[in-house]
Amino acid sequence: MSQGQFRIEELNPFMEWHLHATAASLEIASESAREIARKIERRTRVLDEKGAVLAEGDP
């Protein structure tokens, strides 16, 4: 990953994870995931560059 080391994904209506944003720090990624979950009323998660889930957010 060149832009951000943490991926923020959202669970779309088809129950597929979709890349929503990237962030350089886990703190920013987690905060963004919570905010996105509230705004779009969908579940979100934060992954590291290896694909491990580090945080999840519920609407």
Q: Where do the protein language model's features map onto the residues?
A:
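Short, mixed-charge low-complexity intrinsically disordered segments
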Residues: R38-P59
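A signal for specific C-terminal beta-sheet/loop modules enriched in small/flexible residues
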Residues: S2, S30-S32, G57-P59
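Generic structural motif
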Residues: L11-P13, L26, E49
